[in-house]
């Protein structure tokens, strides 16, 4: 007993000694703020500054003397990018960096299902953790202002409420893996043309009402640990060191406690970077002033020049303590988080998640019969068609490649052609139909006319003998398409696809058009193509998702997260002169102001070809008459709107019920209506469910520039229950007191 007592006493003393020797910053049982304070007190000025800039293409330094590790970052709103060389953009050619390519974020937004966002964030977080990444550069929540923006496919559509609701679960689930979301591009990076210097000018109202809400939700609701600054200027000052957007709004108003990281090469001035809210400077070509073959990370704006300014007293020491504290907080949450899971990559669970997200995001734009009183063309009945011709470069193209920083190295990729052949077998033949060039960034192949003519002629000849033609076309992720670094050059389909569609229709009316893109396109043939599917960029399981929808194994339930204008000038950004879009290369003005997307179409009475929120099903839904819980809402009260929705078809389906609110009379211009709530409802054949939405005074407010505050004006309002922004199923009126 005595020996046991002595052993216990010795063990207790040993534990006490070890505990006493463990610095607070290394003790993960301590609060993060205590750890940050302790680590900061032990660091030299040089060590603090070293945290603030890159040490390689995708990493920033830790504090080796204190055992604080570096931060590793990776591109990847929809997949973890393959390993990049230490000091240039070349791929490192690892053999173990293949991953799951998830659907692009336009597809995720088109699910209108926050559960899919959570599933997405969880899976991509597990892959990033397995790849030992601390910061994932995504999600992107810039608003879809124009269909010409080459990077729209990385974002979540035109509506700030939809983007807000869909980004939050992604961020929360991602960060449960000890991987920081880096929400981008803050703010107003709404075009790629001249993105590095274009000076965006706009009203405070449109900034707060349209372009900031998703970022605000990411910070205040999602708890995002980092934010990426944009390349562009905002009212004369670069977004990566913009005092108004970073210090006042992000850090003061929203109480953001994380890091602001530049887009690569987005810093331009040491003093502004020091005092205007930037925390970590990353760069495309070291500091932008030397060739990337030269190792000059110490010449970054937030490196030696910043250190010298601090020593000379030209910037306050408080700036470096704030930056270092934020970076340490990020490191403790990620690289030094001992509770983080191990992670996994390219698992069956992840493939299943990618497939399900694709299934829920694919949008059935049109599904008409070929002959009057006939059945709609979709789904494709295997017993009805013996010869199915699949046409199109996108049917076989690896759409995980290209696009700039979104390029992915998928472990397994199922093409649309492979997916359809898995269902329909040897009934499926293939013709390329058009050429689209090699996957490249920054340039595009020229396609000889004889190649264009030959491929089209082959497809048309084969279409004559087919029972059904499925054209898988759209855009791709090459330069001047859906790609970083440049905007589209035309609103119409590229590579002669309009002519191909006309030629195919001339020999076979049974045409299903599948558009793979992250943008709207012009459709001069829309009235004559019986079935049109918006298929997005679907990732690893894209072919399976597409086959699930076309075959009817899954009933489509996606709805558009942005409007499809009939012509480009029907889009608000393009309804004015070039100063509105693309600008004069120096500056631009958002002349449509708050009337972005469906807000423009509604208010200006310019019908969209396919409206925001539109999406068909293989079943049908009816809506009952909506009922409000009261005739008026008190200033401190709420009001509910309830509507019954019934599946009147013969198969199960999901309907997205949308609630918009409009102000009957206001002292400032307001859109006809704005999205405030939505619900995705699963219904069996014949089943009916009631959907209830709760409105609060916040749902009725606009940003008042005179008082720099959100307010509503008492009066009459309408709540619109809709199947899309243009398909109003019921209206209830109420008063706001």
Where are the predicted features?
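Short beta-strand elements
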Residues: 727-737
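Glycoside hydrolase catalytic-domain context in secreted enzymes
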Residues: 17-702, 709-726
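Bacterial Sec-dependent N-terminal signal peptides
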Residues: 1-23
């Amino acid at each position: 007993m005595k020996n046991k007592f002595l052993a216990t006493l010795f063990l207790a003393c040993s534990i006490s000694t070890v505990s006493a020797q463990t610095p607070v910053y290394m003790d993960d049982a301590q609060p993060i703020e205590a750890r940050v304070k302790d680590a900061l007190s032990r660091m030299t000025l040089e060590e603090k500054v070293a945290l603030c800039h890159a040490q390689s293409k995708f990493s920033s330094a830790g504090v080796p003397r204190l055992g604080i590790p570096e931060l590793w970052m990776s591109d990847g709103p929809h997949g973890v990018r393959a390993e990049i060389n230490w000091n240039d953009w070349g791929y490192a050619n690892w053999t173990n960096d293949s991953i799951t390519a998830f659907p692009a974020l336009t597809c995720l937004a088109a699910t209108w299902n926050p559960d899919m966002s959570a599933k997405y964030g969880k899976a991509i977080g597990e892959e990033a953790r397995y790849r030992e990444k601390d910061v994932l550069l995504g999600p992107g929540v810039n608003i879809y202002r124009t269909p010409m923006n080459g990077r729209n496919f990385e974002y979540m559509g035109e509506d700030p409420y939809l983007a807000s609701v869909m980004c939050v679960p992604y961020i929360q689930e991602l960060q449960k893996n000890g991987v920081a979301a880096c929400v981008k591009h803050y703010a107003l990076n709404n075009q790629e043309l001249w993105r590095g210097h274009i000076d965006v000018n706009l009203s405070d109202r449109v900034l707060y009402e349209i372009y900031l809400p998703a970022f605000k939700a990411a910070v205040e609701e999602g708890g995002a640990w980092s934010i990426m600054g944009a390349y562009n200027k905002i009212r004369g000052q670069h977004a990566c060191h913009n005092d108004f957007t970073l210090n006042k709004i992000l850090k003061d108003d929203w109480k953001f406690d994380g890091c602001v990281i530049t887009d690569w090469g987005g810093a331009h001035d040491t003093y502004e970077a020091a005092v205007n809210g930037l925390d970590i400077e990353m760069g495309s070509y070291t500091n932008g002033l030397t060739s990337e073959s030269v190792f000059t990370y110490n010449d970054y704006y937030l490196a030696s020049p910043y250190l010298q300014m601090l020593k000379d007293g030209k910037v306050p020491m408080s700036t470096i303590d704030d930056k270092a504290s934020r970076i340490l907080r990020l490191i403790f949450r990620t690289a030094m988080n001992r509770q983080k899971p191990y992670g996994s990559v390219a698992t069956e669970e992840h493939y299943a998640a990618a497939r399900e997200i694709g299934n829920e995001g694919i949008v059935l734009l049109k599904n008409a019969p070929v002959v009057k009183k006939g059945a709609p063309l979709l789904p494709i009945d295997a017993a009805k068609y013996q010869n199915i011709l699949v046409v199109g470069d996108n049917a076989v193209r690896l759409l995980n490649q290209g696009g700039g920083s979104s390029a992915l190295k998928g472990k397994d990729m199922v093409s649309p052609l492979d997916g359809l052949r898995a269902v329909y077998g040897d009934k499926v033949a293939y013709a390329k139909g058009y050429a689209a060039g090699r996957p490249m960034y920054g340039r595009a192949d020229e396609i000889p006319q004889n190649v264009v003519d030959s491929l089209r002629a082959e497809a048309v000849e084969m279409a004559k003998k087919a029972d059904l033609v499925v054209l898988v076309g759209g855009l791709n992720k090459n330069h001047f398409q859906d790609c970083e670094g440049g905007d589209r050059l035309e609103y119409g389909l590229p590579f002669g696809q309009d002519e191909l569609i006309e030629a195919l229709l001339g020999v076979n009316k049974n045409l299903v058009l599948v558009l793979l893109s992250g943008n709207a396109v012009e459709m001069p043939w829309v009235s004559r193509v019986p079935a049109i599917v918006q298929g997005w960029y679907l990732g690893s399981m894209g072919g399976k998702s597409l086959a699930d929808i076309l075959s009817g194994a899954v009933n489509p339930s996606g709805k558009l997260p942005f409007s499809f204008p009939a012509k480009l000038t029907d889009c608000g950004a393009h309804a004015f002169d070039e100063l509105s879009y693309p600008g004069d290369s120096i500056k631009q003005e958002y002349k449509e102001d708050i009337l972005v997307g469906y807000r423009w179409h509604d208010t200006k009475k310019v019908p969209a070809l396919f409206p925001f929120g539109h999406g068909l099903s293989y079943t049908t839904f009816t809506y009952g008459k909506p009922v409000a819980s009261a005739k008026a809402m008190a200033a401190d009260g709420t009001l509910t709107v309830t509507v019954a929705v019934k599946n009147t078809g013969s198969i199960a389906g999901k309907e997205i019920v949308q609630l918009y609110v409009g102000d009957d009379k206001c002292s400032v211009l307001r859109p006809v209506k704005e999205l405030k709530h939505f619900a995705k409802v699963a219904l069996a054949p014949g089943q009916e469910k009631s959907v209830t939405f709760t409105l609060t005074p916040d749902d009725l407010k606009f940003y008042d520039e005179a008082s720099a505050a959100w307010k509503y004006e008492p009066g009459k309002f309408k709540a619109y229950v809709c199947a899309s922004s243009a398909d109003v199923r019921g209206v209830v009126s109420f008063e706001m007191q």
